[in-house]
Curated annotation (Swiss-Prot):
UniProt cross-references to InterPro entries, sorted A to Z: ST7
Key word Transmembrane present: yes
Gene Ontology cellular component annotations, sorted alphabetically: membrane
Single GO BP term: negative regulation of cell growth
Localization in the cell: Membrane
Pfam family, one: ST7
Alphabetic keyword roster: Membrane, Transmembrane, Transmembrane helix
Membrane topology: Multi-pass membrane protein
Protein name, as recorded: Suppressor of tumorigenicity 7 protein-like
Domain of life assignment: Eukaryota
Similarity field: Belongs to the ST7 family.
Length: 559
């Protein structure tokens, strides 16, 4: 998000009355001319309806409406019950088909087909307009739409999972045991693009080993990539990226991966020092230094993750802290999220709070790790003494209120996480890329942080008692936005691309069934019931049909 967007978000969070609220269309009060135009625009359809009724009443004699109604009534009275059975059965069949189609379309596209057609095609033909007074080309409107467009693009951006697993040592072992593929082609293609961005540059043609690795990162077949890495090592035994590929994809254990990453580190440091000495010679050498820096940071980070997985947590914390000090511009890699998880494992809560104080900032992008870790720290101070019965009788203390508000803030940012922390949904292996505020981010967070919530006594109990209150205390917090922007509508589609097909994707906000699904369901049920009653009790239904026709005739004659 832009800095201005975050300042607006903060102003909304503290209840500032002058904070800009994107998407709500707030502006200065309208003058009497604008209100008059709006009133006339809204009353136009009512006036046309009244004019039509008046015209129909005036032409009732020339059009011989009463005689026509009498003829229709006589025709209906002469119909047999079999006709009504056939009519209602046909209506029930048609409405049932419409209902099935509406239900399928809603589950596939998330909207009603009839409503979409009505709004997109029929409403413009009938003269319907948006209930907005400002002109489409006005500067305020264009600025607001541009801000919202940039916001939605940033919200739907896919990020690399900072805690992603190793393909050979973890993902492949899962496939061997279960026979299921935990990664989607879309996710792996994104990783291939990341590797080409991090590990290649325009001077690769100067070194044959880098040329081979450039082709290896584009290769889709894992055995072909591994074969290309060995070819690169034959050309240059100090090819760091070749060791990286082998550690990621060929190593079947974390110990083997760490050994290969240490070899990559030795080679990467040599290449990095050479690039530092030549960086000012030309723009190509500067690009080469950026590439070698990316390789070195990636290797050190993965070594820290290996140490974390092998139980050497303090060593992992030291590597991460050194990385953050040595390469502060690379904050977009979210190394602080790796550091937070390792510090939580050490139960160094004071250090966790210090990291949050730096990164839980209004000018920095939020994440589930940031929001839920902040909630966990506040929950930790009150969870062991929290009791729903006591809270109901005496109310919440100040510390408990702060903890509940932190949970509500975290749930508003990502509402999918609590079901995984409370084990209401089963976890799967996290993908290599996540969508902020989406189901993929929730899986990645809960996969690594569930143990930290379980370690603190009463934390999950407090979460279970309070997380759903986010949707009760604040009306539509996801749709309208409270502490954050409204929940993006693109998360479901992106998560379905990132997560495997055997996982049931969580969807928020909960979609309500459109009106036309209820309408067609009611129409189908009622016509089927009428057909059944007409078939079973033809005389009674005949009397009922005549009574309805007589009442209709009386109403028309009265008019």
């Amino acid at each position: 998000m832009a800095d201005g967007d975050y300042f607006a978000e903060a102003a909304r969070a503290v209840g500032c009355p002058h904070a800009p609220v994107p998407g709500l269309g707030l502006g200065p009060p309208l003058g009497w001319k604008e209100r008059l135009k709006a009133g006339l625009a809204n009353s136009g359809s009512t006036l046309w309806f009244l004019a039509g009724l008046g015209l129909l009443y005036a032409l009732r004699v020339p059009l011989r409406l009463c005689d026509n109604v009498t003829a229709v009534t006589g025709f209906l009275s002469s119909l047999t019950p079999k006709f009504y059975v056939a009519l209602t059965g046909t209506s029930s069949l048609i409405s049932g088909l419409i209902f099935i189609f509406e239900w399928w379309y809603f589950h596939k596209h998330g909207t009603s087909f009839i409503e979409q057609v009505s709004i997109s095609h029929l409403r413009p033909l009938m003269g319907g307009t948006e209930s907005s007074i400002s002109e489409p080309g006005s500067p305020a409107n264009s600025r607001e739409s541009e801000t919202l467009r940039h916001h939605h693009l940033s919200e739907c951006k896919v990020w690399r999972n900072p805690l992603n697993l190793f393909r050979g040592a973890e993902y492949r072992r899962y496939t061997w045991v279960t026979g299921k593929e935990p990664l989607t082609y879309y996710d792996m293609n994104l990783s291939a693009q990341d590797h080409q961005t991090f590990f290649t540059c325009e001077t690769d043609f100067l070194r044959p080993s880098d040329t081979v690795m450039q082709k290896a990162w584009r290769e889709r077949n894992p055995p072909a990539r591994i074969k290309a890495a060995y070819q690169a090592l034959e050309l240059n035994n100090d090819c760091a990226t070749a060791y990286v590929l082998l550690a990621e994809e060929e190593a079947t254990t974390i110990v083997d991966a760490e050994r290969l990453f240490k070899q990559a580190l030795r080679a990467g440091e040599i290449i990095y020092r050479r690039s530092q000495q030549c960086q000012h010679q030309s723009p190509q050498h500067e690009a080469q230094l950026r590439r070698d820096t990316n390789v070195l940071v990636y290797i050190k980070r993965r070594l820290a993750m290996c140490a974390r997985k092998l139980g050497r947590i303090r060593e992992a914390v030291k590597i991460m802290r050194d990385l953050m000090k040595e390469f502060p511009p690379l904050t977009m890699l979210n190394i602080h999220e790796n550091l937070l998880e390792s510090l939580l494992e050490l139960q160094a809560y004071a250090d966790v709070q210090a990291v949050l104080a730096k990164y839980d900032d209004i000018s920095l992008p939020k994440s589930a790790a940031i929001c839920y870790t902040a909630a966990l720290l506040k929950t930790r101070t009150v969870s062991d003494k929290f009791s729903p019965e006591t809270a109901f009788r005496k109310g919440l203390s100040t510390a408990e209120i702060n903890a509940v508000e932190a949970i509500h803030r975290a749930v508003e940012f990502n509402p999918h996480v609590p079901k995984y922390l409370l084990e209401m949904k089963s976890l799967i292996l996290p993908p290599e890329h996540i969508l902020k505020r989406g189901d993929s981010e929730a899986i990645a967070y809960a996969f690594f942080h569930l143990q930290h919530w379980k370690r603190i006594e009463g934390a999950l109990n407090l979460l279970q008692c309070t997380w759903e209150g986010t949707f009760r205390m604040i009306p539509y917090p996801l749709e309208k936005g409270h502490l954050f922007y409204p929940y993006p509508s693109c998360t479901e589609t992106a998560d379905r691309e990132l997560l495997p097909t055997f996982h049931h994707v969580s969807v928020y906000p909960k979609k309500e069934l459109p009106f036309f699904i209820h309408f067609t369901a009611g129409l189908c049920s009622s016509t089927a019931m009428i057909a059944l009653l007409t078939h079973q009790f033809p005389e009674v239904m005949g009397v009922f049909a005549k009574a309805v026709s007589m009442i209709s005739r009386t109403c028309v004659e009265y008019l």
